[in-house]
Amino acid sequence: MGTTSSQSKTLYQKLYDAHIVHEAPNETPLLYIDRHLVHEVTSPQAFDGLRAMGRPVRQPGKTFATMDHNVSTQTKDINASGEMARIQMQELIKNCAEFGVSLYDLNHPFQGIVHVIGPEQGMTLPGMTIVCGDSHTATHGAFGSLAFGIGTSEVEHVLATQTLKQGRAKTMRIEVNGTVGAGITAKDIVLAIIGKTGSAGGTGHVVEFCGSAIEALSMEGRMTLCNMAIEMGAKAGLVAPDDTTFAYLKGRQFAPTGEQWEQGVAYWRTLKSDADAQFDTIVTLDAADIAPQVTWGTNPGQVIAVNQIIPAPESFSDPVERASAEKALAYMDLRPGIKLTEVAIDKVFIGSCTNSRIEDLRAAAAIAQGRKVAKGVQAIVVPGSGPVKAQAEAEGLDKIFIAAGFEWRLPGCSMCLAMNNDRLEPGERCASTSNRNFEGRQGRGGRTHLVSPAMAAAAAVSGHFADVRELSAATH
């Protein structure tokens, strides 16, 4: 699959081949893992497995842990999110101390969402293999690293051996050419891509995003893009590293320095697909065609531009898609033929490993400034990490949000998933900057619409979905 001549390779193939430890006929190749990120939910059983067998963590210096999934965003009290959360966090503290793993706990200034702190601290570097017991590990692919989520038994295997059995994936190139219009962000680009491919369009593939619109994105934007590669069914997402990547990484805590930095950059510049490399699948989009996106259904592929009408199930020729649309509209309590700008919301969530970085908060604050959250709407802003929160506060973004009636919270995964106190009640409708709109994802019976941070802020101040391009053009 994805075979090319021995000379020409895709970026994915270069990364994969560079990490093969052992390969034999009829066996899944064994890959070396450069970085293992750990959080409180998928690690307790893995550490218990090591303990039962009397095994150490093989490379504690390449293993980093944080608390994020079930932490409270209102207090740093470990007891605040309930008994199960408390046990998981206490187990993580105990396990990291026992096995010598660095832990960014609730009181650490760098604590935050695992996929925010990895890049922020320079743990994530181009050319690496990176795993975490979390499906959105694909985020780190923005740096030209092969990053993917693993299950708890695989977490144990990596802790014990620093390796993982991993078959070769197919390759897909997604090219977004041209320039996006005003107000269009990486979130809109990736939702438009998933709208085109469908939520299973990337199944079995590792996706490389390229084209002038991708090259123009900041690292934050590229992380948003790769974060949601998983939402089109892909194993991982990649963007080739370039000067934007190197400028972001330089001087970060775990980034190399001096001569090692120069050597690193020289190697990282080779991490790109060869000009004649063959991809199994190629998808192209014109950036100029992309409008602000809003999901209407219960998977990220059920998405439309904010100025389009909600589709009727009978407009889908595929019977599976038609049935899925019918079920989604019933769950979401929406009618075909209307625009989402006519649909009122109850809650707004700005945060998650998709959109909780400084650039995201700036975009939301620009819309919130001088406006007020609509009556009856609860809007929360959850920075992705301690450093993001500190930077936002240094720039006065917290004051803008609070003045507009948003709640300014502590870092964590928050309302992205119903594993802490931030969740939807049955029937509540939320404009969310997170990555999944499945049934019950944000709370049993909750209705999730995925949007960009600016679109979420626009919905908060309007009380319904709104076209951010009209709002930002209007005078406050």
From Swiss-Prot:
Residues that, per the record, bind [4Fe-4S] cluster: 353, 413, 416
Residue pairs linked by disulfide bridges in the UniProt entry: none
Enzyme Commission code(s) on record: 4.2.1.33
Cofactor: [4Fe-4S] cluster
Keyword flag Manganese: no
Pathway: Amino-acid biosynthesis; L-leucine biosynthesis; L-leucine from 3-methyl-2-oxobutanoate: step 2/4
EC main group: lyase
InterPro entries, alphabetized: 3-IsopropMal_deHydase_lsu, Acnase/IPM_dHydase_lsu_aba_1/3, Acoase/IPM_deHydtase_lsu_aba, Aconitase_4Fe-4S_BS, Aconitase_4Fe-4S_dom, IPM_dehydratase_rel_enz, IPMI_cat
BP GO annotations: L-leucine biosynthetic process
Catalytic activity, as annotated: (2R,3S)-3-isopropylmalate = (2S)-2-isopropylmalate
A GO MF term: 3-isopropylmalate dehydratase activity
Domain of life from the UniProt record: Bacteria
Entry keywords, A to Z: 4Fe-4S, Amino-acid biosynthesis, Branched-chain amino acid biosynthesis, Iron, Iron-sulfur, Leucine biosynthesis, Lyase, Metal-binding
The keyword Lyase is assigned to this record: yes
Record note on cofactor: Binds 1 [4Fe-4S] cluster per subunit.
Function of the molecule: Catalyzes the isomerization between 2-isopropylmalate and 3-isopropylmalate, via the formation of 2-isopropylmaleate.
Assembly information from the UniProt record: Heterodimer of LeuC and LeuD.
Family from the record: Belongs to the aconitase/IPM isomerase family. LeuC type 1 subfamily.
HAMAP family given in the database record: LeuC_type1 (MF_01026)
Protein's name according to its UniProt entry: 3-isopropylmalate dehydratase large subunit
Lineage start: Bacteria, Pseudomonadati, Pseudomonadota, Gammaproteobacteria, Enterobacterales
